[in-house]
């Protein structure tokens, strides 16, 4: 089963709020997911990001591929560097 770490949209109209989830690549954007690993709120200034770091690193270690947007968020949070350092 191929998995991705991606954003699932929540919140009201014109005020998006995103859950950072691990989901099967075949499931819909806001559909079934395996695990919730964090949140992203672009409405705050600066944007608020919360990760469960241990779960995120665990899924990256299992081979879950982050989308481009999630990868940028991981880099800003400093989690991507920890993953790269562990895998080297």
From Swiss-Prot:
Family according to the record: Belongs to the bacterial ribosomal protein bS16 family.
Keyword Transcription regulation: no
GO molecular function: structural constituent of ribosome
InterPro entries reported in the protein's UniProt record: Ribosomal_bS16 (IPR000307), Ribosomal_bS16_CS (IPR020592), Ribosomal_bS16_dom_sf (IPR023803)
GO BP terms: translation
Entry GO terms, CC: cytoplasm; small ribosomal subunit
Lineage, uppermost ranks: Bacteria, Pseudomonadati, Thermodesulfobacteriota, Desulfuromonadia, Geobacterales
Pfam families, alphabetized: Ribosomal_S16
Record protein name field: Small ribosomal subunit protein bS16
PROSITE patterns in the cross-refs: RIBOSOMAL_S16
Cross-referenced NCBIfam families: S16
Keywords recorded for this protein, A-Z: Ribonucleoprotein, Ribosomal protein
Species of origin: Geobacter sulfurreducens (strain ATCC 51573 / DSM 12127 / PCA)
UniProt signal peptide: none
Keyword Ribosomal protein: yes
Domain of life: Bacteria
């Amino acid at each position: 089963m191929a998995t991705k770490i991606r954003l699932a949209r929540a919140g009201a109209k014109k005020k998006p709020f995103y859950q950072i989830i691990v989901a099967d690549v075949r499931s819909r954007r806001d559909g079934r997911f395996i695990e919730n690993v964090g949140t992203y709120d672009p409405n705050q200034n600066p944007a608020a990001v919360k990760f469960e770091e241990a779960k995120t690193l665990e899924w990256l270690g299992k081979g879950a591929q982050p989308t481009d947007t999630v990868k940028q968020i991981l880099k800003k949070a400093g989690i991507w560097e920890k993953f790269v350092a562990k895998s080297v």
